[in-house]
């Protein structure tokens, strides 16, 4: 979408060669970045909406602007501004339906399709005056229902056997063992399955012209994404029960007051609360607390006279017990002072992020088997688990980001503008609990304090050649600082030796797996 832009996994944009987490996202000038691990608010789920596109007035990717208002962005900023109502009532309705019967009866492999393949998108916008020239509103809603097959080792032809490195006979034998000795459901575990995803984006904005000098804006942006069977694990073939569900709810509410103090001074105050919630859970065939997974390696099949192998997994998804809740409070105030020759900007930006994070990767545990025979004999060669040491291993982090800045802009020659600015950003991160045992054994402190204070001078020359508004030359230099990826903070708080302990044992010390018990009693899962 823009030069020097790279689309990385999870739809996180990398700008100008910087880390994807260095890209800032703003909506109406306020934070719209995912507080857990960067990207847009919905980047972790890959949801289709961060905001209804019908609510966006304009957006831009900023990589060559030295304005001090752009903070916490080492690579650049993706910025969007929302629509508002006018004195005229306007609205729209839209619908798009890619019906199942319009889709090919065959999948990409040429096999006849058995599952629904359709997308329905619809919504509306409506805006206008509540009181003309005084009070206006604008609302928008987008909905998407996406249905597409979930393909799990769907072997229907000789070409599929080569593609998946497994035959149906091998799969049937594997599933029979999994059902008889590991309690796997009698429902199909491989093939194609219906997968439906529901997503919504709702937007509302009110603008109140209190008087000739004061404009109050209140807007709310809400997104919802329910991605059933959306979590796929990292084994080559994951049977149906290993797929997890992902639910994401995000909401931001903003209040902005723009005040014209006098002919030369304008003040703009913005206050926002951003809420993000991600809830990952096992699929419907597993208990809500999740169970270990069993990874069987070297599952062999004879295909075209040659032995081919693959890895197959049953049990729970490795992080289908994670939950991330974030509340971000932000206040920004900008003062604009304009004289006949110079435009001044002064402001501050305070942001407090309060997070509760239940990190869950490998908390359910995993068994490794090096053959189907050992899988059948209940003899794994390895067991690994991050065992919780406390009843609730949720970690709480409170992060403060504060910025103060000022700049001037003036015309120094025909078509030549000079911008000089200075920004100072301070960040304070939470400190993990001190672990005496780690210090005694390894000499490492787990309670190291982390904070940053970065001064960022910036200068830019912008030349509109001959002021013909056709040719522009820009030259700028400055320092840009991005905030730390909060996921690193979560890891630091969680892996301090007080919340979990790692179990990693090899044969002959591996406990005998009893998945039937695990499915009925969380306490039966092997711990320390």
Spans of model-derived segments:
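Periplasmic N-terminal accessory/gating domains of Gram-negative outer-membrane beta-barrel systems
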Residues: 1-84, 109-110, 119, 123-125, ...
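Transmembrane beta-barrel strands of outer-membrane/channel proteins
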Residues: 93-99, 139-143, 218-222, 269-275, ...
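Solvent-exposed loop/turn elements at secondary-structure boundaries
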Residues: 4-7, 288, 300-307, 432-456, ...
